[in-house]
Swiss-Prot record:
Catalysis: reaction(s): 5-O-(1-carboxyvinyl)-3-phosphoshikimate = chorismate + phosphate
Biological function: This reaction introduces a second double bond into the aromatic ring system.
EC number: 4.2.3.5
Cofactor annotation remark: Reduced FMN (FMNH(2)).
Species of provenance: Legionella pneumophila subsp. pneumophila (strain Philadelphia 1 / ATCC 33152 / DSM 7513)
Quaternary structure annotation from Swiss-Prot or TrEMBL: Homotetramer.
Class of enzymatic activity (EC top level): lyase
Keywords attached to this entry: Amino-acid biosynthesis, Aromatic amino acid biosynthesis, FAD, Flavoprotein, FMN, Lyase, NADP
A single MF term (Gene Ontology): chorismate synthase activity
Residues that hold FMN according to the record: 125-127, 238-239, 278, 293-297, 319
Protein name as catalogued: Chorismate synthase
Length: 352
């Protein structure tokens, strides 16, 4: 199985399965001399880890990270940084009844026909459990970008199902389990999730990610445009079905006289381009939105086939998120950080 490594100079290779003994990653290309401890990485993992509230999956993982290499006396050495996270709350028996079935909307069918032999427990390698390793790697990138460039990344929930959230206060985002920027809508979100659980169903979401303090010039045309890399990175996240940069699909209805980001001696007058022109960062905030589908792991019975091609009914018994978009926020932040870190090192290698 190929395709487990991301990046050009700052690379991340993840490994492990949902119900295996552990997951982890190897980060290569981190500059030497940066202070780094497990305690630096842990808060980012705590933000993503399951079982923190009744509104997400009830699988409970501590997600304690171990640094195995690449750090000596509290500083990075420039060598590959290996990170390990133990899986401690697997419940593989939940999947015994469906090991020979293809869950609708999941990778079971495609993994079976591509590889012939798959780990059916919790989706194996295709599970969003893998993203914990991305968040750990992204933490290293975020720490570097913040300390050396004063670059900040923030993500939040924009919409859950048909409930659109009004942006009120950035300080509210990390004070609630929904990463919602409006404390007046928290109860609406809570009621929505409770209703989904009772119905045995799920719903999609829209998440926005912002990066501020991005140096002008990051990005490499033509195939490695910054926005192209961001779209590639975001689409690699489980359940993501769409990516917008800046105005995104709203640009279809805009006139050129409105969409163009006019400039003055003091700077740009708007940011419909989302901080990127010609694939290169303008220095404005980078704005990315992602659309996530509703998870197919629901208790409502559904039609499918088994490995013999016979039609059967399936009910998923595992512990799952009614809305995967909630915990996608820290994952998308991590992918933004990995892209920007990689492009920053590439920019330094080529330009002054």
């Amino acid at each position: 199985m190929s395709g487990n490594t991301f990046g050009a100079l700052f690379t991340v290779t993840t490994f492990g399965e949902s119900h295996g003994p552990a997951i982890g990653c190897v980060v290569d290309g981190c500059p030497p001399g940066m202070s780094l401890t497990e305690a630096d990485i842990q808060p980012f993992l705590d933000k993503r880890k399951p079982g923190q509230s009744k509104y997400t999956t009830q699988r409970r993982e501590e997600d304690k990270v171990q640094i195995l290499s690449g750090v000596f006396d509290g500083k990075t050495t420039g060598a590959p940084i290996a990170l390990l996270i133990q899986n401690t709350d697997q419940r593989s028996r939940d999947y015994e009844d469906i090991k020979n079935l293809f869950r609708p909307g999941h990778a079971d069918f495609t993994y079976h026909y591509k590889y012939g032999h798959r780990d059916y427990r919790g989706g194996g390698r295709s599970s969003a459990r893998e993203t914990a390793a991305r968040v750990a790697a992204g933490a290293i990138a975020r720490l570097y970008l913040k300390r050396y460039l004063n670059l900040d990344i923030i993500g939040y929930l924009q919409q859950m199902g048909d409930l659109k959230l009004q942006f009120e206060n950035e300080n509210e985002i990390n004070k609630n389990p929904f990463f919602c920027p409006n404390n007046k809508q928290i109860q609406e979100l809570a009621d929505y999730v409770d209703r989904l659980r009772r119905q045995g169903d799920s719903v999609g979401a829209r998440v926005k990610i912002l990066a501020r303090g991005v140096p002008t010039g990051l990005g490499d045309p033509v195939f490695d445009k910054l926005d192209a890399t961001l779209a590639y990175a975001m689409m690699s996240i489980n359940a993501v079905k769409g990516v917008e940069i800046g105005a995104g699909f709203n640009a279809v209805e805009q006139l050129g006289s409105h969409h163009r980001d006019q400039m003055t001696a003091k700077g740009f007058l708007s940011n419909h381009a989302g901080g990127i022109l010609g694939g290169i960062a303008t220095g404005q905030p980078i704005e990315v939105s992602i659309a996530l589908k509703p998870t197919s792991s629901i208790t409502t019975p559904g039609q499918t086939i088994n490995t013999e091609g016979e039609e059967v009914t399936v009910v998923t018994k595992g512990r799952h998120d009614p809305c995967v978009g909630i915990r996608a926020v820290p994952i998308a932040e991590a992918m933004m950080a990995l892209v920007l870190m990689d492009h920053y090192l590439r920019h330094k290698a080529q330009c002054k």
